[in-house]
Amino acid sequence: MVQTNSFSKGLAKMNLIILNGRVVDPTQNINKKINIEIKNGKVNNYFTGQPKKNINPDKYEIINAKNMIISPGFIDLHVHLRDPGLVHKENIKTGSDSAASGGFTSIACMPNTLPPNDNPKITKYILKTAEKDSKINIFPIGAITKNQQGNELAKIKENIKSGCIAISDDGFPVVNSKLLYEAMLISKKIGVPVISHCEECSLSKDGVINEGKYSKKYDLPGIPNSSEELGVLRDIFIAEYTLSLIHI
């Protein structure tokens, strides 16, 4: 997996003592008030009371985390950074700064850029920009189809080799089942997941609101649940048939 910026390099130099916080770490089955020693960017010790005598406080930054929760960094697998091409909506710096402020240390960005991330040139641009502008790890997701238009496959192998961790057409379903089948065969061989937008557009295309009480009350075209359910069924069947990884 490609790490896209200097975030890990900064962590490697970090020495911290975090006191008086509540640690929530499911990987260690910890959910209690406890102190943490971080040495060279890694958790070295959990302890109660005062730091050990052999810890030189001059070499550590001391943080009082009273009334705070401490946890491993969060991961968001579906982020819209919109860079390149749509930076009036978001860019790599603003998006990663916002993520860091919310406790997210790794994010995966969808290919809904302009042009869409369907080739190595765009993937490399994202990684290079993230190296310069991001405080956190950014992992690009490449498009399944060229321009996300569903007509032909994107450069999936090349994009994964350049640093993409998964493939997706983001908010567009791959309507052509044969194309999705071929994409899943490629993704299986490479070992990356397909992140699927599940929708049967023939049922949802005229809808503006979920079909139900309020669509009827306000006489608005509704989107039935079955439009998503049919999409999920199809994608699961293709994933089962190809034995590939799918994230729905």
For the regions a protein language model found, what residue spans apply to each?
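Hydrophobic faces of well-ordered beta-strands that scaffold small-molecule active sites
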Residues: 73-79, 107, 138-142, 167-168, ...
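Active-site gating/metal-coordination segments in enzymes
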Residues: 132, 139-142, 147-183
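Alpha-helix-loop-beta-strand connector modules within alpha/beta enzyme cores
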Residues: 120-136, 186-196
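Active-site gating loops and adjacent loop-to-helix segments of metal-dependent hydrolytic enzymes
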Residues: 102-104, 128-137, 200-242
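N-terminal metal-binding scaffold of metallo-dependent hydrolase/deaminase domains
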Residues: 1-56
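Conserved small/polar residues in nucleotide/adenosyl-binding loops
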Residues: 247-248
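Metal-associated gating/positioning segment near the N- to mid-region
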Residues: 68-130
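Active-site metal-binding motif and surrounding structural segment of the metallo-beta-lactamase
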Residues: 52-70
